[in-house]
Amino acid sequence: LIVEKGSIGNSFKHWPLSTKTITPSFTTNGFGMPDMNAIAKDTSPAFTFNEEHLSGKRYAEYLSLVATHYNLNVKTNTNVSRVTYIDGIYHVSTDYGVYTADYIFIATGDYSFPYHPFSYGLHYSEIQTFTQLKGDAFTIIGGNESSFDAAINLSQTGARISIYTSKTGLKKEDADPSIR
């Protein structure tokens, strides 16, 4: 069972319009190597859409196609209100009832709980297009993928960009920003 608070791929549908997958999709399945953006064996977003870097809307469409093809049990527009662990079983309370499971995987994503420490400024998830932002100088707080995506897109409008962060991966052994 997959419980989704919105539609399938909801957070991807809310990416800024200019945002694309960072890792390119390649149809390497025939060579025994999966497409890095694929979520199911023998599938490839690159093959499905003939694109190397998919938009969020396109990737959400891929997720929906995979869910349909594999007949996955997805409960959309369903909020989880509580999870309890009783006698070795998880009880997941939703607005449509309680589900039980031996294991649960929490995949809430950045868009579900955006970190907004200030009463001013915009979170990356609030931007639809970078061209809508007025000004010629922007300050970006943060140093991971969204920050650099914003910086690149804003610089293409001719704006001056400053990025401030307390953490970078430049001297880290592991480049995965999710563990910093």
Q: Can you say where each PLM-predicted feature lies in the sequence?
A:
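Glycine-rich active-site loop/strand segments that organize a redox cofactor
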Residues: 3, 7-60, 168-170, 174-177
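Flexible, glycine-rich phosphate/dinucleotide-binding loops
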Residues: 9, 21, 83, 113-114, ...
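Short glycine-/acidic-enriched loop or helix-start segments at secondary-structure transitions
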Residues: 11-13, 85, 115-117, 150-151, ...
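Short, glycine/charged-enriched secondary-structure capping and boundary segments
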Residues: 15-19, 89, 118-121, 153-156, ...
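Feature captures the FAD/FMN-dependent oxidoreductase FAD-binding
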Residues: 45-112
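A generic local structural motif
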Residues: 91-94, 123-129, 179-180
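A Rossmann-like FAD-binding core segment of flavoenzymes
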Residues: 156-180
